[in-house]
């Protein structure tokens, strides 16, 4: 653990972080590279935590598609779209990233290196967030709206497939951390009261984790057994 520089038993680690975070972080390095597990990073609920960042991108797209479906804008088949309308730099970057997915999977399998998938998903999530900030998916001309919605849905599918390969869940919704609700507030998806409530809940969860950690460190020595994480 980077927090203390000591070993920590795997079952103790899973008391503090989710299985999803553990799997994502354990797969974040090449097989030949030692892993210093950053426990503080693994419990963060913001864009610095890679698994949270990727899962949030997926959940945000699910929310977007559900809202558009309620408004009568279902995701269309590619054949019915005018993809030439997708010409903004952020749209082109996102399509280029999507096209790289099959090759990344091939290379990860060839080299026995799942960390390639980790890095790809983080990069793809970043490309989506930049696209989402720059390109409106609401109130646009119908043909452009349909094309952008399909692009977002394709990102959703690739994120789900990539997370599944890593054994990490792809949640349709997420309990709000600071990053998630700050982004939603900026996009006008929630109000200030909801964002403040989410921030308070996040602080309470962090305090609970600190208390559990203090109690465990006080009552139980750190183990150096075979199942330790270093």
Predicted feature residues:
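Non-catalytic interaction-recognition regions
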Residues: 1-197, 202-213, 230
């Amino acid at each position: 653990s980077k927090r203390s520089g000591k070993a920590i038993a795997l079952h103790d680690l899973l008391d503090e972080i989710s299985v999803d975070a553990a799997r994502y972080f354990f797969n974040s390095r090449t097989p030949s590279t030692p892993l210093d597990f950053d426990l503080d990073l693994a419990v963060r609920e913001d864009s610095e935590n890679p698994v949270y960042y990727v899962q949030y991108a997926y959940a945000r797209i699910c929310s977007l598609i559900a809202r558009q479906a309620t408004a009568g804008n279902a995701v269309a088949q590619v054949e019915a779209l005018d993809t030439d309308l997708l010409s903004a730099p952020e749209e082109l970057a996102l399509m280029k990233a999507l096209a790289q997915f099959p090759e990344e999977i091939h290379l990860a399998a060839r080299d026995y290196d799942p960390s390639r998938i980790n890095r790809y998903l983080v990069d793809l999530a970043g490309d989506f967030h930049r696209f989402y900030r720059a390109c409106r998916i609401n109130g646009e001309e119908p043909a452009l709206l349909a094309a952008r919605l399909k692009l977002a849905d394709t990102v959703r599918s690739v994120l789900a497939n990539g997370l599944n390969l890593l054994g990490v869940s792809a949640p349709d919704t997420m309990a709000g951390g600071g990053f998630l609700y700050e982004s939603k507030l900026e996009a006008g998806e929630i109000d200030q009261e909801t964002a403040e409530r989410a921030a308070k809940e996040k602080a309470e969860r962090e305090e609970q984790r600190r208390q559990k950690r203090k109690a465990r460190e006080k009552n139980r020595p750190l183990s150096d057994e075979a199942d330790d994480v270093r």
